[in-house]
Amino acid sequence: MFDPRRHFGEIIPSRAKRCAFSVRQRISLAGAFMSNDDVYAAGLLNRALDPTTQPAAIQAFWRAEVDVLRKVITEGMRVIDFGCGTGRHLLQLSDRLCLGVGLDYEHSYIVEAHRHATGRPLYFITCDAVAVPLVEALDFAMCLASTWGTMSDKTAVLSEMRRLAPRPGARLLSVYSPASVPARREWYRRLGHAVTEEAPEYLMTEGGFRSEHFTEARLRSLVGDCIIRPLADIAYLVTF
């Protein structure tokens, strides 16, 4: 039986003690400093999960992710989800998992994930994705819904994914492609975060949220040896 006391180091729920989920960037907006951390803490994810806020292209992307996971994640696997939010993906896969571990820096999301995980082989922890308090390697690591594109220390997150799922090909990212920009602009507007800056590699909103998109060339430069496949017209799946 999985004993979290044996596998986890110190779990740090306090934001003051967290070194930032991936050294999140802080920006100045109307004289105030905000970050993705602040925006998520204000409940952005909870609103984003509401299907009525999602353009059709975003809904198709999320459905395609789940379809892929149900093909990749097989019976009895042990899986870790980086940036799990409220545990959506692990909860959907729990019927086939031997163990699911979800991690996120936003403690309120972890509390919500725990609330739905009763009786399932799932554990959720508040921690930093660049310093996961887990000792033993698992079978598979994933970072989905372009969460990796909101992290600034992407290389360190990849290193932790490799450490915790050392088998080549046992790590999966899903990220937005440049084709996602129109759908994301509309989605963020519906969420009350209208886009104020569009750059070749990211969108920035008036609420302080920064979300990146990736070309295949940029992905290969960041990830290294990997397999890249298009997903739902607006994203890529990256296996490494």
Q: Where do the language-model regions lie?
A:
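Conserved class I S-adenosyl-L-methionine
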Residues: 2-73, 172-196
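Class I SAM-dependent methyltransferase "Motif I" SAM/SAH-binding loop
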Residues: 83-85
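Class I SAM-dependent methyltransferase SAM/SAH-binding core
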Residues: 87-130
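A short acidic, Gly/Pro-enriched loop at the edge of an enzyme's catalytic core
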Residues: 130-141
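A short SAM/SAH-binding and catalytic strip from SAM-dependent methyltransferases
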Residues: 140-153
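A short glycine-rich, Lys/Arg-flanked "PGG" loop and its adjoining helix->strand segment in the class I
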Residues: 155-167
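Short alpha-helix
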Residues: 206-225
